[in-house]
Amino acid sequence: MVQAPVARPMTFEAFLEWYPDDGRRYELIEGVVVEMLPTGPHENIGGFLGAELNFEIRRSKLPYSIPRTCLIKPQAEGSGYMPDVVVLNRELLKQEPCWPAASVIQYGATSPLVIEVVSTHWRDDCGHKFVEYEAMGIAEYWLVDFRALGAVRHIGQPKQPTITICQLESEEYQMRRFVVGEKLISGVFPHLDLTADAVFAAAGSC
């Protein structure tokens, strides 16, 4: 992850106008533009999860779609996030003011699930994004820590590859951890047949 020098904090609107068409991924974190530089294994997992969820969407005939890229505009000023996987409710996209012109959502109901594959900058995934997705009312947030990078308070002891599924209940996330040998349980995809083992194996050689 590379942080671009800025003279003053950037607004989300300025970030959206600035965003270059260079094939790279950028996020805005507290007014600072950050280039995301995911590893190959990181991208493998994101692609695998997107494919698995797309299959489940078709199989269960759900009104969802997964865009190739999508920016999430949280309530906090000066921030904009690009999760590894964003599941959108197609029926609610009409309420998104930016959607006709840009792949941007700002209402939590539009995205029932977002997934972040944890990187070396796990504090953003477990900190800023956790708080902001919760405040937006995004029903489910997955943290896929396939390299066990997060703090013990997030992934438990002993540290091991962990998928934390955060489900919104009474406006607060309730967290459940899944490790090797366990099947994932999702409220958004109740019939999903997916294990933590399969997700971690998708990374390939790390």
Summary of predicted features, one role per range:
Residues 1-206:
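Gly/Pro/Ser/Thr-rich low-complexity, intrinsically disordered segments predominantly at protein N-termini
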